[in-house]
Amino acid sequence: MKKTIFAFVVLGIMAIACNSPKQKELAKADLPSAADRIERGEFLVATLGCNDCHSPKVMTPRGPVPDPNRLLSGHDSNETLPEYDPQSVGGYVLFNMNGTAAIGPWGTSFAGNLTPDATGIGFWSEEQFVKSIKEGKYKGLDNSRSLLPPMPWEGYSKLPDEDLKAIYAYLKSIKPVKNIVPQAILPGI
């Protein structure tokens, strides 16, 4: 009988200890805040080079830099691509001056608008964003085409989900830019 009472007392003490406010505070401390998540996302966007393709550029004395008024807004819908001779560029990949459009064996691809505007990722869910990177799906939709080169989604797909969610949080926090990016031009079309 004493052993049974002792066992219940020990179990009771353990239950109280495991559910103490201190434990709950420690668990909450382990979760990153929204600000921490956005800061992590900003760091990842900068180090992964997202601006290289997704931001129109302005020319400076040091060369082209991302246009601060159009950061991550993708290929400018008002920009026309120059003419080129497909025969003379044979085995090459061409980029426009902004780096937001690329021509290759896959056709012509245009960097997407990653801002939270409705013309960008404004209506995307976090799950869609993660799926687009993890599985290379256009707009993160199951029955959509694959993301086109030069988007290096295969490499980025190895990022932990928490990093992709941090990138998403950062992108949702930046200035929205209205810009409807042209559809890809696939070969033979």
Predicted regions and their residues:
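Positively charged n-region of N-terminal signal peptides that target proteins for export
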Residues: 1-4
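Electrostatic cytochrome c docking/interface patches
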Residues: 24-46, 58-60, 80-84
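Bacterial signal peptide processing site
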Residues: 19-22
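Surface-exposed aromatic
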Residues: 145-154
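Electron-transfer interface patches adjacent to heme c in soluble/periplasmic c-type cytochromes
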Residues: 69-128, 153-164
